[in-house]
Amino acid sequence: MAILFLDVDGTLINYKAQIPSSAKEAVIAARKNGHFVFLCTGCSKQEILERHFDFELDGFIGGNGNYIEVQGTEIFHKPLTYVQCKHFTDWCISRSLAYRFECNSGIYISDDYMEKSVQARMKYAFGNNKSAVNAPTNPAFRKMTSKYRDDVNKTAFVLNSYQDYLDAVKEFKDMVVGTWGGKGQLALYGDTSPEGISKEFAINKLLDYLHIDKKESICFGDSSSDLPCLMPVI
C-alpha cells in the first residue's frame, strides 16, 4: 500500500481547470488497488469543493500545509492571526496592490482585484498564448466582507513587479512569503502564510497520523512550489 500526494493546478488538472480523463482514471485505479490518494495544494477547502471532482479522495492538505483533512475530518488547521491579516491588508492598501484572502469558506477578493489581476489570470491560464481573449475567474471568489479576519489560510497579492515580492519578504518577518504563477517559477502573485508551515511539514504530520512510513509515499507536482513535497519522501 502506498500513499500518493497530488498537487492540483498543473498536476491533477491543467491551468484551465480541466482534469484529463487519464488523471481521473489513475486516481480511481490507485484507490481501487488499496492506495491512499491525497491532494497536496496551495488551494483552500472551498476551492477544492468548487472543482466538483466526480471521484473520491482520501483527503487533502490545503493552504500549502496549514490545513489537513482526512476522510472529511479536520486533523490540523493553523490560519494567520488577526494581527497578521491586518498588517498584510494595510500594507497592500498602502501600495495599491490588489489582494485576496484564501479561507476554507472561499477566496475573498479586494474591490480592485478583478480589474488589476486580469493580466496575471490570463498568463496563469494561457501562458503567452496571444489568442486568448477572456481572463478566467474562480468560482470560489467571494466579495470581501471584512478587511481583517482570523480564518485566513494564506493571502495572495498581484505583483506589479518582482520588487513587491522582495519588499514583502522584508515587511512580513513573522510569515512565510512566496511567489507563484503557473508553470515553473513564473512569478505573477506574491503570497503569505503562517510561519513554520509547509507542504513538507503537513505531509510529515499526516504520515504520523496515519502511521505510514515515508518510504510508502509518492509525490507528484509540476513547479518549484511543489519541491517541499519531495523532502519527506526522499
What is each model feature region?
Residues 2, 58, 234:
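Conserved acidic residues
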Residues 18-124:
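Active-site phosphate-binding/coordination module
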Residues 2-17, 39, 88, 230:
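Asp-based phosphoryl-transfer active-site loop
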Residues 10, 65, 221-223:
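Active-site metal-binding loops of divalent metal-dependent hydrolases
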Residues 4-6, 60-61, 219:
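Residue-level marker for buried hydrophobic side chains located in beta-strands
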